[in-house]
Design a protein with these regions (language model features):
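Short catalytic-site patches enriched in acidic/histidine residues
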Residues: 1-5, 95-100, 104-107, 135-172
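A composition/biophysics-driven feature that prefers long, compositionally simple stretches
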Residues: 1-119
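Active-site pocket-lining segments that scaffold enzyme catalytic pockets across diverse folds
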Residues: 117-124, 137
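Structural signal for well-ordered, non-membrane alpha-helices
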Residues: 121-128, 145
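C-terminal helix-coil-helix/basic helical segment that borders enzyme active sites and/or dimer interfaces
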Residues: 128-135
C-alpha cells in the first residue's frame, strides 16, 4: 500500500517505450518488491531534486516538448516541481486518460470487487447480529474489523456511531 507523502514517488509513462519509476532511495526495495514488470527505477536522495529525474526520463526517450498528463489528484508541489524541471512541456490534467482507465474493469477486477463486497456484507451481518446494549462505538468497530479479518479481508476503516453522533458523522 502506498500513501501520499511529502516525498515524490511517481511513474513516468511515455506514449512509446518503457516506463520509469522515480522514488526516494530508501523506498527502492519496497518499490521493486511491488513491481510485476519493468525494471527502470530511478532514485533520489534528500539533497537531490526528484523532478530532475523526470526531466532525465523524458530526455532518455528523446522527448523535447509536448504535454505531460498528471493524475488529477496529484498535489500542487509535484505539478509545480515537474513544470519547473521541464518548462518546455505543458503539464495538463490526465483526467481524460485516468478516468477511462478507472471506469473499465476486467472480469478479474470485477471478481475481486465482488469478493471484497461479499466479505464486507458478511461482516456487517455478523456485527448486526451481535450488537448488544451497552456496547460502545469502539466495541462495534473492533467487532467489524475482527469479522472482516476472519473472513479473509483487510479492514481499511470502520466507523460506528451511536445516538446523536450518528446524525453528525463529520462533527458539528
Amino acid at each position: 500500500r502506498w500513501w501520499r507523502s511529502e516525498r515524490f514517488t511517481g511513474v513516468v509513462i511515455p506514449a512509446e517505450g518503457e516506463f520509469a519509476i522515480i522514488t526516494p532511495y530508501f523506498e527502492e526495495p519496497s518499490v521493486r518488491e511491488s513491481m510485476a514488470f519493468g525494471d527502470d527505477v530511478r532514485t533520489w536522495n534528500e539533497h537531490e531534486d526528484p523532478f530532475a529525474l523526470v526531466a532525465g526520463v523524458l530526455k532518455d526517450h528523446g522527448l523535447q516538448r509536448g504535454k505531460i498528463a498528471v493524475e488529477e489528484t496529484v498535489r500542487h508541489f509535484i505539478v509545480d516541481g515537474i513544470q519547473q524541471a521541464v518548462p518546455e512541456f505543458d503539464v495538463v490534467s490526465g483526467k481524460p486518460i485516468t478516468r477511462g482507465c478507472r471506469m473499465l474493469k476486467t472480469p478479474a477486477e470485477i471478481a475481486l470487487m465482488q469478493m471484497a463486497n461479499d466479505v464486507t456484507m458478511a461482516a456487517y451481518r455478523h456485527v448486526h447480529a451481535n450488537i448488544d446494549k451497552g456496547m460502545l462505538p469502539a466495541d462495534i468497530s473492533a467487532m467489524m474489523n475482527q469479522a472482516t479479518r476472519q473472513l479473509g479481508g483487510r479492514p481499511g476503516f470502520s466507523m460506528a456511531l451511536l445516538n446523536d453522533a450518528s446524525a453528525y458523522p463529520h462533527g458539528t
